[in-house]
């Protein structure tokens, strides 16, 4: 206990040299916080602390003894090595923060190193949705305007980028929307049926990607003189229904006329029969 208080007293009263370092890692990994000191600095005592979001004692080195069994949110996830570097892990989403190691040499000189640890989530496989824009009068024939939306669920600090491949001479119009490149608008032509677009979602420590072929969502065929199956249905089905209805109407009308003629014939025969009887 006296060693701990003496180290804190050194930090408060003696000149301290501070070196700051940024460390990036991801959830589930272990990260080594390396303790570095000047050449010839022979460490006699050292103390590792978490400074933010809460100040906690993590590990100490005193008289050649390493100690890590201090009550903190890292209890059971801390290992202090002989070179005084501290390993934390497996890391959790709330482990980001500021850490410091205070070292005192055999002559009483102090050296402090602060480290900022940023823990990112691992990037999941992004989801890509394809939306087809309604055709406009000014839109060239046999082209398809699509919007590609990329999204990595349940994660922040993500940037998006796109790449495409498939047609060597692809020269369709491509525009990126939003500052993080999450939405892409693409104009496709008949020669771009096989062009595949890949969305890459990434953060500083991990990435993943998803590939789609947007022409499959355009729902039309190349205009090469052949009618598509959809176009055929649009013509054949109405004509067939019209012919069926016309046939039904003709049959009904024929039956109606036949009934009227039969009644007329019956009216003409009855008087003659009556006269013959008389």
UniProtKB/Swiss-Prot annotation:
Transcription in keyword set: no
Intrachain S-S bonds: 150-199
Cytoplasmic-side segments: 253-278
Transmembrane segments: 232-252
Location within or outside the cell: Membrane
Cited PANTHER family: SIGNALING LYMPHOCYTIC ACTIVATION MOLECULE (PTHR12080), SLAM FAMILY MEMBER 8 (PTHR12080:SF92)
The protein, known as: SLAM family member 8
Native source organism of the sequence: Mus musculus (Mouse)
């Amino acid at each position: 206990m006296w060693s701990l208080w003496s180290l804190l007293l050194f930090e408060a009263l003696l000149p301290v040299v501070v070196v700051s370092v940024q460390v990036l890692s991801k959830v589930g990994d272990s990260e080594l916080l390396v303790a570095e000191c000047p050449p010839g600095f022979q460490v006699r005592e050292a103390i590792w602390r978490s400074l933010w979001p809460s100040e906690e004692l993590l590990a100490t080195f005193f008289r050649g003894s390493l100690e890590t069994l201090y009550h903190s949110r890292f209890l059971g996830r801390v290992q202090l090595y002989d070179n005084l570097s501290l390993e934390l892990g497996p890391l959790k989403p709330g482990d980001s923060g500021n850490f410091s190691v205070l070292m005192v040499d055999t002559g009483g000189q102090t050296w402090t190193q602060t480290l900022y640890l940023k823990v990112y989530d691992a990037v999941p496989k992004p989801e890509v949705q394809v939306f087809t824009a309604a055709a406009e009068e000014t839109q060239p024939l046999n082209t398809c305007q699509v919007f590609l939306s990329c999204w990595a669920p349940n994660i922040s600090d993500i940037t998006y980028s796109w790449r495409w491949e498939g047609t060597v001479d692809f020269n369709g119009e491509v525009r990126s929307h939003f500052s993080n490149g999450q939405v892409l608008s693409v104009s496709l032509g008949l020669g771009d049926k096989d062009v595949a677009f890949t969305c890459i979602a990434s953060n500083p420590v991990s990435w993943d990607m998803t590939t789609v072929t947007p022409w499959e969502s355009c729902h039309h065929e190349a205009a090469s003189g052949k009618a598509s199956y959809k176009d055929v249905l649009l013509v054949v089905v109405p004509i067939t229904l019209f012919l069926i209805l016309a046939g039904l109407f003709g049959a009904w009308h024929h039956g109606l006329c036949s009934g009227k003629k039969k009644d007329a014939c019956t009216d003409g025969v009855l008087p003659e029969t009556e006269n013959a009887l008389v």
